[in-house]
Curated annotation (Swiss-Prot):
Stored PANTHER family: APOPTOTIC PROTEASE-ACTIVATING FACTOR 1 (PTHR22845:SF5)
Keyword check for Transmembrane: no
Chain ranges of the CARD domain: 1-91
Name recorded for this polypeptide: Cell death protein 4
GO-annotated molecular function: ADP binding; ATP binding; BH1 domain binding; BH3 domain binding; caspase binding; cysteine-type endopeptidase activator activity; cysteine-type endopeptidase activator activity involved in apoptotic process; endopeptidase activator activity
Any one of the GO CC terms: perinuclear region of cytoplasm
Encoding gene per record: ced-4
Source organism of the structure: Caenorhabditis elegans
Binding site for Mg(2+): 166
Description of the deletion phenotype: Mutants exhibit a block in almost all programmed cell deaths that normally occur during development. RNAi-mediated knockdown causes a defect in egg laying in a small proportion of animals. Also causes a moderate increase in CEP neuron survival in response to high Al(3+) levels. In an ain-1 mutant background, enhances the proportion of animals arrested at the larval stage, with egg-laying defects and with a ruptured vulva.
One Pfam family cited in the UniProt record for this chain: CED4_WHD
Length: 549
């Protein structure tokens, strides 16, 4: 029979055992220790609920065992070290430092270890620990903390492919001791990525499985011929036992996932490349954009993974070239690092040349990222675009990367189908098309500085350059040359057209105010539009040679 202190330890641990202990798992182990008999095991196994099995297990163990050692050994053997540590610390503090028992053992230590167990049971992936984007991680924690009292909500974590959305979500859930276990009772993390109509049904079938307790897994019903209405009803019933669960839908592509989650009134953290899927939600929505790494972050990122820092101007130029070509994309930088063997700047310079000559497939390797190359991930983004948006993206290849370009110049090459010759309507249609590309995968980025401009990053341009056929590139250059010539012949120095109504708040009273002459101005002025290709002659000469090869 256990002594009083050990009996109290088991009583204190009862709540924890309810969360994370199945007595059936321990029966065979303890039979081998001659603590339980076959009759004891049969009695416990026949209990219909886990709560009954736990209660009878503890009742028998208190009377049959002489110490907690065998049970502690089982918890270590069963990868439940947080339970073993709790019992050991309880006994130690209860005997040697009883005043510290509650604050030291019962509260903080167990909550952290229980969090790890909850993350494991919730299918939350283990992510990198050597580098954390503190700003983004803390924003996710803050938003989830602020929204925890809402009946249902969506927090959208959106950004370009390979920007680290899933990593940030996982790091936020692992970093905070308050989110899982206090603000939210439990968590369910599932990868979506589906594009087929049946994908949503399969995803929520997995949710039903995750919501079921271990008691029900062996009796999990077949859903092969179940309708979506019945499946939703089954999930609602399962949510009665898991009312305060945070759901993480990773890499959502279809808005149908959002519609299902809204019908079920779930609390959701969603990672996606397409922020437009949020339009399907009518509940409370919050957004966090995951941008590319800044230059100093790129240095820290590579240094955290063991890349030596540059010594001298030549090595610094090589590293800056890598950062420029990757556009600060974490997944691409990771591929650079994994491919850079030995870790020298000579090898990195070779990879830069390979990337420029062969495109993103030139740096292809296995990393923690889901794809071997970013080209595969971007291709998947393109596949879900409409034909009109794909066509617009293809012609974006004739624009120089890293340059903020006014919509007027984009209108020279982006194909749109309108029945009017009005320049204002044309520019509005082109602006809408480019905005969609900036929302659906961050394929472009837009600014108002103070006119509306759009920019294509180096990494997106490099991708397009090697997937768009040469004839389309040649046609785009030819069309741009012709349109710029027409603009020059019309002597358009100051646009006379009206600014669209939805841009009115950015309107200036004169052209000189619209395009202020400051040393920081980087946007091409209207009178320089005809000279656009001359200003970027090196780029266009290179692109023409590439299209001719």
């Amino acid at each position: 029979m256990l002594c009083e202190i050990e009996c109290r330890a088991l009583s204190t641990a009862h709540t924890r055992l309810i969360h994370d202990f199945e007595p059936r798992d321990a029966l065979t182990y303890l039979e081998g220790k001659n603590i339980f008999t076959e009759d004891h095991s049969e009695l416990i196994s026949k209990m219909s609920t886990r709560l009954e099995r736990i209660a009878n297990f503890l009742r028998i163990y208190r009377r049959q065992a002489s110490e907690l050692g065998p049970l502690i050994d089982f918890f270590n053997y069963n990868n439940q070290s947080h339970l073993a540590d709790f019992l050991e610390d309880y006994i130690d503090f209860a005997i040697n430092e009883p005043d510290l028992l509650r604050p030291v053992v019962i509260a903080p230590q167990f909550s952290r270890q229980m969090l790890d167990r909850k993350l494991l049971l919730g299918n939350v992936p283990k992510q990198m620990t050597c580098y954390i984007r503190e700003y983004h991680v803390d924003r996710v924690i803050k938003k989830l903390d602020e929204m925890c009292d809402l009946d249902s909500f969506f927090l959208f974590l959106h950004g370009r492919a390979g920007s680290g959305k899933s990593v940030i979500a996982s790091q936020a859930l692992s970093k905070s001791d308050q989110l899982i276990g206090i603000n939210y009772d439990s968590i369910v993390w599932l990868k979506d990525s589906g594009t087929a109509p049946k994908s949503t049904f399969d995803l929520f079938t997995d949710i039903l499985l995750m919501l079921k307790s271990e008691d029900d897994l062996l009796n999990f019903p077949s859903v092969e011929h179940v309708t979506s209405v019945v499946l939703k009803r089954m999930i609602c019933n399962a949510l009665i036992d898991r009312p305060n669960t945070l759901f993480v839908f990773d890499d959502v592509v279809q808005e149908e996932t959002i519609r299902w989650a809204q019908e079920l009134r779930l609390r959701c953290l969603v990672t996606t490349r397409d922020v437009e899927i949020s339009n399907a939600a009518s509940q409370t929505c919050e957004f966090i954009e995951v941008t590319s790494l800044e230059i100093d972050e790129c240095y820290d990122f590579l240094e955290a993974y063991g890349m030596p820092m540059p010594v001298g101007e030549k090595e610094e130029d090589v590293l800056n070239k890598t950062i420029e070509l990757s556009s600060g994309n974490p997944a691409t930088l990771m591929m650079f690092f994994k491919s850079c063997e030995p870790k020298t700047f000579e090898k990195m310079a070779q990879l830069n040349n390979k990337l420029e000559s062969r495109g993103l497939v030139g740096v292809e390797c296995i990393t923690p990222y889901s794809y071997k190359s970013l080209a595969m991930a971007l291709q998947r983004c393109v596949e879900v675009l409409s034909d009109e948006d794909r066509s617009a993206l293809a012609f974006a290849v004739v624009m120089p990367p890293g340059v903020d370009i006014p919509v007027k110049l984009w209108s020279c090459v982006i194909p749109v189908d309108i029945c009017s010759n009005e320049e204002e309507q044309l520019d509005d249609e082109v602006a809408d098309r480019l905005k969609r590309l900036s929302k659906r995968g961050a394929l472009l980025s837009g600014k108002r500085m103070p006119v509306l401009t759009f920019k294509i990053d180096h990494i997106i341009h490099m991708f397009l350059k090697h997937v768009v056929d040469a004839q389309t590139i040649a046609n785009g250059i030819s069309i741009l040359e012709q349109r710029l010539l027409e603009i020059g012949n019309n002597n358009v120095s100051v646009p006379e057209r009206h600014i669209p109504s939805h841009f009115q708040k950015f309107r200036r009273s004169s052209a000189s105010e619209m395009y202020p002459k400051t040393t920081e101005e980087t946007v091409i002025r209207p009178e320089d539009f005809p000279k656009f290709m001359q200003l970027h002659q090196k780029f266009y000469d290179s692109l023409k040679n590439f299209a001719c090869c």
